Every structure is written in C-alpha cells, then in structure tokens.
Amino acid sequence: MNSLRPLTRYDAVAMSLHWVIALLILLDFALAMSFSQFDPGDVLYLPSAYDLHMAVGMCVLGLSVARVIWRLTHRRPPLPDMALPLRWLACASHFLLYVFMVLAPVSGWLVLSLRHQVTSVFGLFRWAWPSLPAIAHMARPERAFWHDHLLPLHVQISYVGMCLVALHVTAALYHHFVRRDGVLVRMLPLRTLRRGKHSPAGERTTTPLTPESPS
C-alpha cells in the first residue's frame, strides 16, 4: 500500500507551515532588532513596529501549534543514513526549534499581558490581547515587577532561538552541498527550485526541472 511506502518528501501542509513560520520568525526578529535603532520617543515608527511585532508573534504561535499537531499526527521522511550521534543531534535540534517556536511568542504574550496594552492588529483593528489567567488580576506593582524580569527573558529566548535557526540552516546546507543526500530538497515545494534530483542514496540525476505534479 502507498501509505506504507517510505516518504521521500514532506507533504504540502508541512512545507507551507515550515516556510511561512520561517519567514514570520525572520520578520519578527528583524523588527525587534530595529527597536534599538530608533529613539524611544519616536512616535512615528516605534508604536507601529511594536504592534506589528506583537501581531506577527501571535501568528507564529498559532501556526507553530498547528505545525506541532501536524507533526504528531502525520508521517514524515526518515532521517538520512548518518552516525548515531548526528541523528541524536538532529532530533534534539528539531525538538528545541519546536520549543523555541512556541516559547518565544508565549513569553512575548506574557509581557504583553503584564502591560494590559491595546495594539493594532496589522492596521485592521485595535484589540487588547487576552491576558493570561495568572496575570489578569495582578496589582500594578506586581505586574511591573514581573514585566521587568520577563522582558529580558523573552529577548534571551529569541537570541537562543535564532542561534538554533542558524544551526538548522547550516545543517540543511551541509546536507545539500556536502552530503548531497536530498535532505533540503524534500522540504522545497517545487523541483524548479533545485539543480537536479537527489536520490535517497545521495546520487544525483539529471531529470528535467519541472513543477511537482499534484498527487
């Protein structure tokens, strides 16, 4: 049966979630890095940038939860043939990436809850994000105390997460250009995005570059 055959590529939903989340994470990190480049009193840029950062972060959270659920309920291609320590490292790095994709926006949500701040959602409407239950009834001094401690934690989580992203990208490029085992191309939506077809054994063929036919 086809359902029992080894998978060679990720399905369309997994690929879509992967690339959309990746782009949103890079956008959100770039926005966060831009905050320090402007004067705190810049009323033209900073409020809109903060609002966009928060809205994108919430999108990352929702899509990451969907990605985790999809990952747990659907098959994926097996890891390539490599040494056991490298397989452990690959599994650990993927697990930590999932933790980062959820923990970074949740920690940001905690900071936002402590502010009781109304934000613009992509310029479409203004909305006060729901406060998490443990924070909703805190007194102002207590909220200020936790805000001053959680905001640096949110920043540190983001930096660690971007290091994981850099490691993930480096590993993907290593598999593609050094090992040539097809790990990268199985997450690409179109064959036209690659320079040839990689077999599971790492051998390269010269099949025509055509869009993937629908299954």
Could you describe each region identified by the protein language model?
Residues 1-215:
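Membrane-embedded alpha-helical bundles that constitute the cytochrome b-like, heme-associated redox core
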